[in-house]
Amino acid sequence: LEVVKKIGDVNMGLFNKKKSDFIKIKIEDLIEWNEPNGNGCVVSDRITKEGFKVGYMYREQPDEQNPDSGWRFLAGNEDDEYMANSNNHHIFAINTICNYDKDIIPFLHSKTGSCYIRVDSNNFELDDGTKSICVEKRKR
């Protein structure tokens, strides 16, 4: 665990041994996360290393063996081969990912099974399979 910030008893930041490849950002306290299974989430390197916004996010049943929120965040341009390589995605504290892309915050308490796509620079919608994902890089 690479602790970027400690909030009370909760460590916030990277759950990964190598942080040098990740885009460095200032971590602020943006959310309070009190859900029982923890605050971990799986995030594509396209977001944390390449600078893309979250384009596709879904919440699956959390892994009860780990501090897992169930959230999975992708840029939206990852293919099966990219995702099959475990070196291309990492576990982060959910507050950290909110700092990479604040647009996800209103959706975080959605129920398990929820799936959203970015439909333009600032908006997400429930994914019903009829719209394309808006894939874009963050402005620095």
Regions from the language model: what does each represent?
Residues 1-11:
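Short, Lys/Arg-enriched N-terminal segments with co-localized hydrophobic residues
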Residues 27-45:
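Short acidic, Pro/Gly- and aromatic-enriched capping/linker segments at domain boundaries
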Residues 54-60, 114-118:
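Broad, structure-driven detector of short, well-ordered beta-strand segments within folded domains
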Residues 91-137:
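Short, compact, well-ordered microdomains
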Residues 13-17:
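Short, aromatic- and cysteine-enriched interfacial helices/patches
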Residues 57-107:
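Acidic, aromatic-enriched beta-alpha/helix-loop junctions
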Residues 48:
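Short, acidic, Ser/Thr-enriched surface-loop or helix-capping motifs
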